[in-house]
């Protein structure tokens, strides 16, 4: 199963650019092609909700490379969510992130 995260924001157009750029950088760091997919948004009450899916190959590299060493959380899925959230935040993104499926 591929990790799936739900991202939410009030500034979808701006955040989409930041998230894509950050994930492309992470993809390059992992030396993986097609490591993520951003799904179409759903708009509700001024918020945009969109899913971010990681490939199993990218997940494997993140897990085995030690990138998540300082990620806090109870269990692997929460640590991965926190790692991705902090990575996006470090690149200027202000999206909210939650586990949708893992």
Regions from the language model: what does each represent?
Residues 2-8, 51-53, 94-96:
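Ser/Thr- (and often Asn-) enriched beta-sheet segments in non-cytosolic proteins
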Residues 32-75:
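Short, intrinsically disordered low-complexity segments
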Residues 10-12, 55-59, 100:
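Generic structural motif
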Residues 1-25:
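Short, extreme N-terminal segment that most often corresponds to the first beta-strand
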Residues 29-33, 65-68, 86, 90, ...:
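Surface-exposed polar/charged interaction patches
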Residues 75-102:
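Amphipathic alpha-helical binding modules
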């Amino acid at each position: 199963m591929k990790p799936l995260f739900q991202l939410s924001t009030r500034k979808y157009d701006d955040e989409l650019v930041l998230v894509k750029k950050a994930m492309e950088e992470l993809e390059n760091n992992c030396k993986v092609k097609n490591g993520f997919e951003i799904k179409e948004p759903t708009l509700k009450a001024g918020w945009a909700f969109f899913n971010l899916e990681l490939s199993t190959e990218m997940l494997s590299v993140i897990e085995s490379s030690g990138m998540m060493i300082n990620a806090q959380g109870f269990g692997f899925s929460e640590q991965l969510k926190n790692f991705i959230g902090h990575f996006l935040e470090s690149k200027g993104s202000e999206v909210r992130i939650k586990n949708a499926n893992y």
